[in-house]
From Swiss-Prot:
Chain spans, region Disordered: 80-104
NCBIfam families according to UniProt: PRK01777.1 (NF002490)
Domain of life: Bacteria
Originating organism: Alcanivorax borkumensis (strain ATCC 700651 / DSM 11573 / NCIMB 13689 / SK2)
Protein name: Protein RnfH
Stored Pfam families: Ub-RnfH
Gene3D superfamilies for this protein: RnfH-like
Matches recorded under InterPro entries: Mopterin_synth/thiamin_S_b (IPR016155), RnfH (IPR005346), RnfH_sf (IPR037021)
Family: Belongs to the UPF0125 (RnfH) family.
């Protein structure tokens, strides 16, 4: 008797390079295992799948090794923030204030 397979997608994106890989995995496969089976870790030198945060359709999953995928789910591998969001907001507010003063 053959294993039941499900179709899932694994995605990862950098500003200059993005990958979406569709693959069939055995029913009962974890999010982490699907990411490893996709081979995406070999396409991005700095990507450590064991440590990378992951989610499904925009929702972070705390334990990718324990999340069993459902048919059609998309595993999203997130990269770390390159800038502090608070500092970015402050910078934008300061620029907006400066632009307002310049127009007066």
């Amino acid at each position: 008797m053959s294993e039941t397979m499900i179709h899932v997608e694994v995605v990862y994106a950098l500003p200059q390079k993005q990958r979406l890989i569709g693959l069939d995995v055995p029913d009962g496969t974890s999010m982490l295992d699907a990411a490893k089976l996709s081979g995406i870790g070999e396409q991005f030198a700095d990507l450590d799948l064991d440590k990378a945060p992951m989610g499904v359709f925009g929702k972070v999953v705390a334990n990718p090794a324990g999340h069993i995928l459902k048919p059609g789910e998309r595993v999203e591998i997130y990269r770390p923030l390159t800038a502090d969001p608070k500092l970015n907001r402050k910078r934008r507010a300061k620029e907006k204030a400066s632009a307002g003063k310049a127009s007066n």
